[in-house]
């Protein structure tokens, strides 16, 4: 579990994602570090209308086109093993930066989006006696 993941989970309600999605919870299974047969989904969310499951993959630095295949494996698992009638699955990559390979791969993949995050670093003056 990364610091980025922890921060996003703890601050979910303060993000744009919370307007459309909630973090998936079903009985004792949660959408954080959601286990599949091809790895762990960082965050699994479900739309407020329960019609769309969103597979979120987080990358600390630069994301490249390899993450598209990883995300598609997770989305395939959700589609095959988890979706109920009428539901669909989408993917979201969140990273600090992207590269040309990722942009090319996403240009032909309509069910995966990319969002950049920004870190604000601030130094605070502290008075020590």
Q: Where in the sequence are the language-model features?
A:
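Charged, terminal alpha-helix-loop-beta segments
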Residues: 1-129
